[in-house]
């Protein structure tokens, strides 16, 4: 190996991110008047409050509002399922479908908007 060398798969092979991990598809709407950008590993429950989340009903295809004041909603412990170091930008009025994947590792959340600040699976919200 040469220092700084990047070794990739052959061109005919795809790199599959988060293979075999559970995912959640939701719709996200920017109700604010400014663009909002969310990074790859940002705890999605704690993103800017101007973003509204909706589940997609599998039968009717209708949107079902996800209450963000409930800290145990489906986005808890989830992040965007995109390559590390990248982000998704939501322009004012945008409605986008995004895929979320559970945070891995120790599943401890500190900082962000201060809603968890501890172990995800047993934290006391502040």
Curated annotation (Swiss-Prot):
GO biological process terms held by the UniProt record: urea catabolic process
Alphabetized Gene3D superfamilies for the sequence: Urease, beta subunit (2.10.150.10)
Matching InterPro entries: Urease_beta-like, Urease_betasu_sf, Urease_subunit
Database matches in Pfam families: Urease_beta
Gene from which the chain derives: ureB
Assembly notes: Heterotrimer of UreA (gamma), UreB (beta) and UreC (alpha) subunits. Three heterotrimers associate to form the active enzyme.
UniProt-recorded name of the protein: Urease subunit beta
Family: Belongs to the urease beta subunit family.
Pathway involvement of the protein, from the record: Nitrogen metabolism; urea degradation; CO(2) and NH(3) from urea (urease route): step 1/1
Keywords for the protein's UniProt record, in alphabetical order: Cytoplasm, Hydrolase
Superkingdom as given in the UniProt entry: Bacteria
GO cellular component: urease complex
E.C. numbers: 3.5.1.5
Record bears the keyword Cell membrane: no
Subcellular localization: Cytoplasm
GO MF annotations in UniProt: urease activity
Reaction(s) this enzyme catalyzes, per UniProt: urea + 2 H2O + H(+) = hydrogencarbonate + 2 NH4(+)
């Amino acid at each position: 190996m040469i220092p700084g060398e990047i070794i990739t798969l052959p061109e005919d092979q795809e790199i599959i991110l988060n293979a075999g991990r559970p995912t959640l598809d939701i719709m996200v709407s920017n109700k604010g008047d400014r663009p909002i950008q969310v990074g790859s590993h940002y705890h999605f429950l704690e993103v800017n409050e101007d973003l509204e989340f909706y589940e997609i009903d599998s039968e009717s295809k209708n949107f079902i509002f996800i209450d963000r004041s409930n800290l145990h909603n489906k986005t808890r412990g989830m992040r965007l399922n995109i390559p590390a170091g990248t982000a998704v930008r939501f322009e004012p009025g945008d409605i986008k479908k995004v895929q979320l994947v559970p945070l891995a590792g120790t599943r401890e959340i500190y900082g962000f908007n201060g809603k968890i600040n501890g172990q995800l699976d047993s934290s006391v919200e502040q």
